[in-house]
Design a protein with these regions (language model features):
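Surface-exposed interaction/gating patches
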Residues: 150-151, 155-164, 223-242
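Long, glycine/tryptophan/cysteine-rich extracytoplasmic
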Residues: 1-53, 93-116, 168-238, 278-321, ...
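C-terminal substrate/ligand-recognition segments
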Residues: 237-244, 262-275
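Transmembrane alpha-helical segments in integral membrane proteins
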Residues: 38-68, 122-142, 230-258, 317-334
Length: 334
């Protein structure tokens, strides 16, 4: 008996595509007269996630008008909650159950649905960020530092683009590191895989243990691991780049908010770690579960790429706070 996950394409409709581009986790359940099993699939492909983000950004530009920063925050929460609820409703109506048979050899019942809670959170985050980015004007930057999410997003965006450019430049000369990281099967789609790889390397640049392909990257793996010297040098260089950007950011925060009585570094570190965690959550690729009896040609076992959400949140917060504090303190020596 054989069953290929690719056969599910026959049951996909436009509602499933909408949920898929919002990076929801699909739960697949299959059963026969003799056994049953389930698989969870989360494909956190960032390029796909940009589709709803750009659509929400465009709608925010057209429809949302704000007069003050407080209205912007309320609108952002409202749009995020509404978009998340819409995805939940779509998910409820898109749950699918089907039967697959192969002459008289076997009967297979298949059902799949998206994770409702995750879809709501994804929708809320996408709706909130897109509305907030469009509505938050520079003239409010110094008025309410507790809403200073945009500065953290800009810092992470600079780091992401820098990491992507570094990876792209190295790949043009020699893409051997892709083979070393276990990504050789994707070397033909260099731009696509690098956009995904950059998010993993960015998490690692914040000292977060990260799984990439067949490798578990951490500070200890660079020191004692079996990676080639060139690959280790690349990873160390990106870590130093992260250090430099955060030190400069801390330095600029001191100059910008030198008269503020609030703990600017703490507030920024919280925003920074939350956004890094969101990026990590959206970029995780996971296939896992148990399908006994079924010989599924496209299912090779548990696969995980990315970093743990809780680990990312804690480590990136501690790391960013320490490095930002260094940059913040350096301005005192002027």
């Amino acid at each position: 008996m054989s069953f290929n996950l690719g056969e599910l394409i026959n049951f996909i409709n436009p509602l499933h595509i909408i949920l898929g581009i919002n990076l929801g986790t699909i739960n697949l359940n299959a059963s026969t007269m003799m056994n049953s099993g389930s698989v969870s699939i989360h494909l956190g492909v960032l390029l796909i996630g940009l589709i709803p983000l750009f659509a929400l950004l465009l709608s925010s530009v057209i429809f949302i008008k704000n007069k003050n920063a407080q209205d912007i925050l309320h609108n952002s929460v409202g749009v995020g909650a509404t978009y998340g609820l819409m995805l939940v409703i779509i998910s409820i109506f898109s749950s699918t159950s089907s039967s697959i048979s192969q002459m008289i050899n076997y009967g297979l019942a298949v059902s799949y649905r998206y994770n409702i809670l995750e879809l709501f959170l994804n929708g809320f985050i996408l709706g909130f960020i897109s509305t907030y980015l469009i509505g938050y004007k520079k003239k409010y930057f110094g008025q309410n530092i507790y809403l200073d999410i945009k500065k953290a997003i800009n810092t992470i965006l600079i780091l992401y683009i820098a990491v992507f450019v570094i990876l792209l430049g190295i790949s043009i000369v020699d893409n051997g590191y892709l083979y070393e990281l276990g990504l050789y099967n994707y070397s033909r789609n260099t731009t696509f895989i690098l956009s995904q790889l950059a998010s993993y390397i960015l998490a690692f640049a914040n000292i977060v243990p990260t799984t990439i392909g067949s490798n578990k990257l951490s500070i200890l793996s660079i020191i004692n691991g079996g990676l080639l010297f060139d690959t280790k040098l690349m990873l160390i260089s990106i870590i130093f780049l992260s250090l430099l950007v955060l030190i400069l950011t801390g330095y600029n925060l001191r100059k910008k908010f030198k008269n503020s009585s609030s703990n600017i570094v703490l507030i920024f570190s919280i925003c920074y770690s939350i956004i890094i965690t969101i990026l990590s959550s959206f970029s995780v690729i996971y296939v896992g579960g148990n399908m006994p009896l079924l010989q599924m040609n496209s299912y090779l076992g548990n696969i995980f790429m990315g970093s743990g959400i809780f680990t990312t949140l804690i480590i990136s917060f501690i790391y960013s706070y320490i490095i930002l504090k260094i940059g913040y303190t350096l301005s005192d020596f002027e």
